[in-house]
Amino acid sequence: MNTAPPRTTQIFFASTLYGTATLAAALDAGCFADADRRILLVSNNAAVPETTASLDAMPGFDALRGRFDDVVSWNTTIAPFHPGGWAPRPDDVPLWERHLRLAWGLGDDDIELAVESIQVNPALAVAQIFTGAPVDVYADGLMSYGPTRNKIDPLVGTRVRRLLHLDLVPGLKPLLLTEFGVAPQIVPSEVFLKVLGELADAPGAQDGVLSVEAPALLLGQYLSALGLISAAEEEELHLRMMRGAVALGHTRLVFKPHPTAPAQWSRAMGEEAEKLGAELTVLDEGVLTAPVLAEVLYQRMRPALVVGCFSTALFTASAFYGLPVARVGTEVLLDRLAPYENSNRIPVTLVDALLPEVTDRAAVERSGAARGAEPVAAADLTGLVSAVGFAMQPRIYPGLRPAAERYLAAHLDTTTWRYFKRKRLTSLALPGAVPAQLAFLPRNAVVRRVARSVRRRVVRQ
């Protein structure tokens, strides 16, 4: 008697339109095997989901919808709990899997998962519920180049087969999940660009996006909401973006604020624009009918310059669209990020190391002509990321110590010091912990004798 092979259902977990576009590109590129059914599991991770549009309600989503057989809301599934704050109790995991198989019509299908940010909920919760399912992790931003932010349960980490990521920094391999031997796989850039083109051309995707000829596009991130800087400092950061763009000769400015940013920032920028003699358009809720991806603006407006702090969109502008880019404020963030293992550290480091400051006219002009970031030796960049990654998560990546020591011994200078903290280097006994002028002390016989004497007296007491 012949037994039919088991059905396979692939569940794709997404919380952003950009992430869904990454998944769509991976599907179009053949990165996933055929399956009997594909479900897009949508999560709205906003602080107050009820007041924010879910990604499946955003303009342009319909262009991506056809890749999936069904769309399911994770928020509805676990209501009234918030996706970022809920996970199943260990004893309840079998009950939850049984419930979801019934609710989603999965039956006895073999399950395969594709999730983002597996180290935290809600993606971690989904991976925990489907205990035996193999997992593919996809990363759509710069954080993929950094270390895993938390130690992942081996019962989850060892199930991860690969890391799908965009080639935002050519030649640099992601650190994420390498502690489990997970191999990275690039989602082809040309396929991703094609998907973004579909988003830009979709009905309603450009509603309210004004046709401004070759403006300087300023990207807001609402960093104060993350506790990285104060609201006043972030407002000043936006004004610095404006002044820098105008100093480079741009008088038509378009500001894309974070969807939840305070309206008073836009007013302050309007006043500054008048002083600078510039024309400012703010793409807020008074202009747009819904949030729009920066990449849609790149195709619609073809900006002459893109300015931001450490947004991934700076790299997509430079690497994928060949647009001139400039950074503002990374030096402040490198100093302020706390604790040192803050997961934003690698994105800020990459932007600071590879993209030009808005005050550097020549470098900004080169950034567009070169179609990519400022050239940095691959070994130097890999060494920098390895050193910062080890300093961030030494317990997760102990194998990176030799690479970190080599980099610090050879490259620690006035330029690279901003990526490290002396206290951190000291706690890890890394090069640079002791100032160069005092480096002779550990090798001095007299100093060693005094230290031993003091140590003995302390022990006796």
Where do the protein language model's features map onto the residues?
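Well-ordered, non-membrane alpha-helical segments in soluble/globular domains
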Residues: 21-24, 54-55, 93-97, 231-245, ...
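A nucleotide-sugar donor-handling region in carbohydrate enzymes
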Residues: 138-230
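Catalytic donor nucleotide-activated moiety binding site of glycosyltransferases and closely related
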Residues: 248-289
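Short, charged, surface-exposed secondary-structure boundary motifs
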Residues: 49-53, 145-151, 290-293, 335-344
